[in-house]
Amino acid sequence: MKAIYGALAGAIGLLACSAGALAQQNLDTFRIAIGGFGLWATEAPRLGQQAGIFKKHGINVEYYATAGAGESLQAVISGSADLSVGVGTTGVMGAFAKGAPVRIFGANFTGAGDLYWYARAESPLRSLKDATEKTVLGFSSNGSSSNTVAVALAEETGGKMKLLAAGDQASTFTQVMSGQIDLGWAAPPFGLKEIAEGKIRIVATGNDAPALRDQTVRVDIASLKVMTERKEALARYVKAYRETLDWMYADPRAIEMWAANIGVPVEYARKAAFDFQPKAARDFDTITGLDKLMEGAVRQKFLAAPLTQEQLSTLIQIVK
């Protein structure tokens, strides 16, 4: 009798596993490359997946980290990723102008107040006014939003500083602390602990470049193949994404989950989300400051000339 019950239990377990696998197979999967992995502004795919929001809409997301938004853009262009979130707008414009099969399907972040630049505590740099021709300021990768902001900050100093692609936040921090570069980029909560401990101090934020305050510096992108061949699934992804954004700012559990994901105290996570990345800056439907963004892209040589209205209409296709 025990053998019969054991066999029955095993069969039931096998059926449950099979049903779970079948349910997973019935979900539409999107592979997402994330440059600023772990940042609040790029955390919606992971949190929405963990909270079951995407599954509710028949979507499964597979996310992975890249060294920066530039690498994420290339992943979408090559087809190794379907989507990316938080990619520098000017970099996307430049790639599109060169014929890359990529489209913008939503805004990610407007303004630049969520990024800051820091120096070692013993550094003589206390503000951008202290920068010289020898000052090296780091950003993540070419075409990223930190690249756009770095250029704008350099312009505020009269073009004095040297700019360097320094990689992700951890790599940049190592370079600052070892003296390889003078100013490193970061987005909270990264660095808040070190600031509190007096190891580093903030020298500038994205808001020190006033021209960027009303510009949508980061966008969410999809491959042309996804936009044309998977419209219905992408619409469900966007519906789940919007629901996730609302939940992230309304439910305290979202902050707790994020803090656990990135291994920081909840108070640091809460400060990073609500002080540096308010929901107003996360309007998915509105991309602003395009003329200024294109001017910057031309100066940065991402664009040979501003995109035409027809080109912009082709590139930007907000999914409702």
Please describe what each predicted stretch is.
Residues 24, 228, 319-320:
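Short, solvent-exposed mixed-charge patches
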Residues 17-23:
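Sec/Tat signal peptide C-region and signal peptidase I cleavage site
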Residues 297-320:
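Conserved C-terminal helix/tail region of periplasmic/extracytoplasmic solute-binding proteins
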Residues 227-303:
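Secondary-structure end/capping motifs
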Residues 170-260:
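Pocket-lining segment of extracytoplasmic ligand-binding domains
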Residues 56, 208-213, 278-286:
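Short, solvent-exposed loop/beta-turn-alpha elements that line the ligand-binding surface or hinge
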Residues 24-159, 163-166, 175-178, 182-188, ...:
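Short, glycine-/small- and polar/acidic-enriched structural segments
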Residues 1-9:
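Bacterial N-terminal signal peptides that target proteins for export
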